[in-house]
Amino acid sequence: MSEREVRLWPEFVKALKQEVVPALGCTEPISLALAAALAARELGKAPERIDAWVSANLMKNGMGVTVPGTGTVGLPIAAAVGALGGDPDAKLEVLKNLTVEQVAAGKQMLADGKVKLGVAAVPNILYAEACVWHGDECARVAIADAHTNVIKIELNGEVKLKREAADAKPVETYDLGDATARDVYDFAMRAPLDSIAFIHDAAVLNSALADEGMSGKYGLHIGATLQRQIEAGLLSEGLLSNILTRTTAASDARMGGATLPAMSNSGSGNQGIAATMPVVAVAEHVKADRETLIRALALSHLIAVYIHTRLPKLSALCAVTTASMGAAAGMAQLLNGGYPAVSMAISSMIGDLAGMICDGASNSCAMKVSTSAGSGYKAVLMALDGTRVTGNEGIVAHDVDVSIANLGKLATQGMAQTDTQILQIMMDKR
């Protein structure tokens, strides 16, 4: 191993272990549910009412999504059931043990006007705070900058925990600052298998979500619709159709409130699905063995993380597009394209999808998952044929890492006003 590999490879393993984790339900409402669950535990008494505040971006991403196990949309129900039945030790799976009675109690709390929600005047892009009351007693918990990153705990005004968000981040932080796409590729292809074998769980969890989504009872049931159109002769069978139906079905289930966890990426279940299911579909098509699948998944998820480190945690840019760039890398490798095809496919996707907006988490996210998966496979086919969007076109550069950096600039600097306008439009609809 080179000195560079000795330094970077442990960072890659830490990045995968920190960013690719199971999550039940859309992670923005779940973050508020976790804050409420932690506050309820601190209070130690039956919650009677809840005051909650979230950042503007978290408000945008939580307004239109179904909270798993509840059949109800929005942040207030997440706070209510989090306080009444959440397991604070389960973190992003905080709602995994909800009972029918707890869900009913949460809905009654909403009907009685006992849950108040507002936008917090904070600089944090990701922020969730819950104050859970019993009589005049109150416990307050705040989470900032990462979905499980607790920065404040108070009980009846007494501070139990308070720290700056930067100081509260997980011990296992990682640094991909000077990494390149080529570094990621070399790691995924040559790392000891036992150091990345855990990534196979992504295929297991997200495939189960896809199977559940194919039942047709979740969200916009796009995956199931596409399958019915195949059977009706309106859409041809084949690898592309399989990629689209399975990837989209998993997102349907995820956004439609299925009580199954997704393997997330960079704090998002849809990003985890987007980075997983196209790779799984292609691996099955080429009859890849377990090691080949694991390495393709590691490549996909780590490329997704690498690109996301160049983006804000939440922004106006739909990050399913960037997670799907990881999937394109994994698919290109499975189809024997090697690193040249990987870099070409990513460049073409930036030329294709850059600027797709995030207008909040909702059932329609599955549309964007489908679009991004299709773009990824198209870019791979182009790369295998020696074609890519070139550095002479738009924000795409000759070098893939420069193209990724340009995409990051677009999201960070160019789309800030877009984000504000999207939220205003959504708030006007309430």
From Swiss-Prot:
Q: Which GO terms label this protein's molecular function in UniProt?
A: L-cysteine desulfhydrase activity
Provide a GO biological process annotation.
Answer: L-cysteine catabolic process to pyruvate
Q: Name one Pfam family in it.
A: SDH_alpha
Q: What is the superkingdom listed in this entry's lineage?
A: Bacteria
Provide the family line. Belongs to the UPF0597 family.
**PANTHER family associated with the record:** UPF0597 PROTEIN YHAM (PTHR30501:SF2)
Q: What is this protein called?
A: UPF0597 protein CV_1824
The species is Chromobacterium violaceum (strain ATCC 12472 / DSM 30191 / JCM 1249 / CCUG 213 / NBRC 12614 / NCIMB 9131 / NCTC 9757 / MK)
